[in-house]
């Protein structure tokens, strides 16, 4: 696809070309992190921590939701005391069992594959953490599963719309904070705060209001 460089210096044309409003939603990533972090209660963290450190953390999600698990794996790093793995479904690996923590992540709370895996985890007696909007099928499944912990997430919107690909940071933040409680990530809250500040900085530097000559 050919790109007209002149478009980069025409703010009105650039904004008009962004019909999906991805630019403002991406620019609000820092705010999304802070909003998501404010929804992670100490009670929820304590409920996860009280069951002890799992043998493995298995994050299940599709698309941008799965990317949240990849972020957790990267933040935990190779030095994590337990392995952190991400799967897209449609089923759990055979070795996953009651000593493992399954984290079901869905920006819509309705992803069929994620719902199937979460239900399978419940049947196996796995520890279950659900990260999804409230009042969705996935959140309801957590409510009906003994011992499961559900963390609600707000969906960042611009003019009443939202895009799945912009939810990554909102979904990853609860995972990092929970991992901090389990001792898998050091200084988790500080890391989350620093990430939000850095994303704010990048959004400012890369703003369409800046001349393309100085826009990074």
Residue ranges of predicted features:
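Cofactor-/ligand-binding subdomain signature composed of acidic, glycine-rich
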Residues: 1-42
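Extended interaction regions within the primary functional domain
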Residues: 7-9, 189-212
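Compositionally biased, low-hydrophobicity segments enriched in charged and small polar residues
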Residues: 1-9, 52, 148, 211-216
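A short, well-structured juxtamembrane/interface segment
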Residues: 34-51, 205-216
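Short N-terminal helix-initiation segments at or just after the protein's N-terminus
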Residues: 1-5, 40-48, 113, 117, ...
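Short, flexible coil/linker segments at or flanking structured domains
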Residues: 5, 10, 21, 45-48, ...
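Glycine-rich phosphate-binding loops that contact phosphosugars or nucleotide phosphates
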Residues: 52-200
């Amino acid at each position: 696809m050919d790109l007209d460089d002149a478009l980069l210096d025409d703010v009105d044309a650039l904004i008009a070309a962004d019909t999906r409003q991805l630019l403002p939603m991406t620019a609000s990533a820092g705010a999304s992190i802070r909003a998501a972090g404010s929804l992670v209660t100490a009670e929820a963290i304590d409920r996860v921590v009280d069951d002890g450190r799992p043998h493995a953390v298995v994050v299940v999600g599709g698309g941008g939701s799965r990317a949240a698990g990849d972020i957790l794996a990267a933040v935990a790093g190779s030095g994590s005391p337990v392995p952190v793995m991400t799967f897209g479904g449609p089923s759990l690996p055979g070795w996953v069992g009651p000593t493992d923590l399954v984290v079901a992540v869905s920006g819509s709370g309705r992803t069929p594959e994620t719902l199937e895996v979460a239900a399978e985890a419940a049947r196996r007696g796995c520890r279950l953490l659900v990260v999804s909007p409230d009042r969705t099928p996935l959140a309801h499944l957590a409510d009906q599963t003994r011992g499961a912990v559900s963390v609600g997430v707000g969906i960042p919107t611009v003019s009443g719309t939202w895009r799945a690909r912009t939810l990554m940071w909102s979904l990853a933040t609860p995972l990092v904070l929970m991992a901090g409680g389990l001792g898998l990530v050091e200084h988790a809250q500080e890391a989350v705060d620093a990430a939000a500040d850095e994303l704010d900085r990048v959004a400012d530097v890369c703003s369409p209001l800046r001349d393309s000559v100085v826009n990074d």
